[in-house]
Amino acid sequence: MGQPVVVDSNIIIKEMQEGRSLHPIAKRIKKHKSKMVIPESVLGEVQKVTGNEADVIMDTIYEYCKYPVTMDKTDEINAESDRLVEQYYKCHYPDSLILATAKITGSALVSFDRELLQTAKLEGVQAFLPRNFVRWW
């Protein structure tokens, strides 16, 4: 099995609003026999922005990925998130939780947020813009 991949909320939001962003990522994950990881904080953020309930959001994800892994916050993820907020001036909640989830689970991270991607790289987490993930991962 390949490396898991954490998908940021901005990918799912863009998919729900415009389409086209999640499908190529899901195809790449499937090709590598990997898992798409959806942190609890991502679901919350997507709900807040789109106004959709969690089941509607998950239905959108299920269209392209049959078995995503939803990840609850753990004490370890919360502690890592707090450390990231303290260490990096530009790393805020909920981005810190998303990055902490990727780091603790050994996952790659896909996001449109360049500051989050930069912080991820400083933390040793593989991080990609969607187009680069589809092209190079």
Question: Where are each of the predicted segments found?
Answer:
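Short, well-structured N-terminal submotif of metal-dependent ribonuclease cores
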Residues: 1-38, 49-59
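Acidic, PIN/NYN-like endoribonuclease modules and their adjacent C-terminal/linker elements
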Residues: 1-7, 104-137
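Alpha-helix/helix-capping structural signal
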Residues: 10-11, 41, 114-115
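Short, structured coil segments at secondary-structure junctions
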Residues: 32, 64-65, 123
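A short acidic, often aromatic-flanked loop/helix-cap motif at beta-alpha or helix-coil junctions
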Residues: 45, 73-79, 132-137
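Helix-adjacent hinge/juxtasegments
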Residues: 55-61, 67-74
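Active-site neighborhoods of divalent-metal-dependent phosphate/nucleic-acid chemistry enzymes
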Residues: 69-118
